[in-house]
Regions:
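N-terminal ordered "arm"
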Residues: 36-95
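Cysteine-rich micro-motifs
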Residues: 21-34
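Structural detector for short beta-strands of small beta-barrel domains
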Residues: 36-53, 139-193
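OB-fold/S1-family single-stranded nucleic acid-binding modules
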Residues: 91, 97-144, 149, 153-157, ...
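Short functional micro-motifs and their immediate structural scaffolds
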Residues: 16, 35
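Short, cysteine/histidine-rich loop/knuckle motifs that typically chelate Zn2+
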Residues: 9-12, 29-32, 90
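Short metal-coordination and nucleic-acid-contact micro-motifs, chiefly zinc-binding Cys/His arrays
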Residues: 2-7, 23-26
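Short nucleic-acid-contacting surface segments enriched for D/E, G, S/T with interspersed K/R
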Residues: 77-95, 206, 212-226
């Protein structure tokens, strides 16, 4: 599906002329700018291979998703300032980028990080601000949104989580069944959200095997309930769905970070 870009992906200003393109377009000023220092509302912190993480969020200037990328992967140190986790869900964080580097399909959100600039914490959003953000950018039908092939990150309004469970093979895994707001069922979707993974691993360690019912009850009875979905890079001919955050207001995890739970379990999840 071809889309028409009318605004600059970096600054949000109107382009001189509309351009038919799946990916974002830079205006002439931004194209010649060089470094971009942008404030990002963090909405996703996910587990990758080899101890790396993936971070992404929303640019409140353009209301588009941004995924900071680094040539050799993002180490967990990128998220921290000393012992404090600077990059946390719904923190506003300033990050400097070298360039916009989108794929032609799905992964149109990629921006290359300037590794010489440490992320700077600005503030944490209030509950009302979080509600305003997710209300503005959320979708009700994940299948329809994916058909456009113009993004790989989505915040989905959800009717309910039907099941959540863990598996242990070569590494600890969690999967979810859920129904989006329009009634579509998604089954056995893997969870890569570090906070959810670390929380559930901690619950198991303390012997709380009823964690599934507790999460579903707290999530399904919250009036503000969303699941953030990310699509993988192409693998075996598909872009696979992953759950990259469980979002509720008030917060399902009482404002705790994944690093808090990893400290409790004594290692990386």
């Amino acid at each position: 599906m071809q889309l028409t870009q009318t605004n600059c992906i970096a600054c949000g200003n109107k382009l001189p002329v509309p351009i038919i393109s799946n990916i974002g377009i830079l205006c002439p000023t931004c194209r010649n700018q060089g470094l971009f220092r942008k404030k990002i509302i963090i909405t996703g912190i996910t587990r990758m291979n080899s101890g790396h993480v993936c971070v992404s969020g929303i640019d409140p200037q353009t209301w588009s998703f941004i995924r900071p990328v680094f040539s050799c992967g993002l180490a967990r140190d990128f998220l921290m300032q000393g012992t404090s986790q600077v990059i946390n869900h719904f923190n506003l964080v300033e990050i400097e980028f070298k360039q916009y580097r989108p794929d032609q399909k799905f992964h149109t959100e990629d921006w290359v990080i300037n590794e010489n600039f440490a992320p700077r914490f600005v503030r944490h959003l209030s509950n009302q601000e979080i509600i305003n953000v997710v209300s503005k950018i959320s979708i009700t039908n994940l299948n329809v949104a994916i058909e456009k092939q113009d993004k790989s990150l989505f915040i989905v309004m959800v009717q309910s989580i039907g099941r959540i469970w863990h598996e242990q093979y070569e590494k600890f895994r969690v999967r979810i069944n859920f129904v989006d707001w329009d009634g579509n069922l998604y089954e056995k979707i893997p969870v890569t959200d570090l906070l959810t993974l670390a929380f559930i691993r901690h619950q198991i360690n303390i012997g709380n095997m009823n964690y599934s019912n507790q999460i579903m009850s707290n999530f399904n009875n919250n009036p503000n309930r969303y699941i953030r979905i990310g699509l993988t890079r192409e693998f075996h001919g598909q872009h696979w769905k992953q759950v990259t955050a469980l979002i509720t207001v008030p917060d399902l995890f009482d404002g705790q970070s994944f690093s808090y739970y990893e400290n409790l379990i004594g290692g990386q999840v």
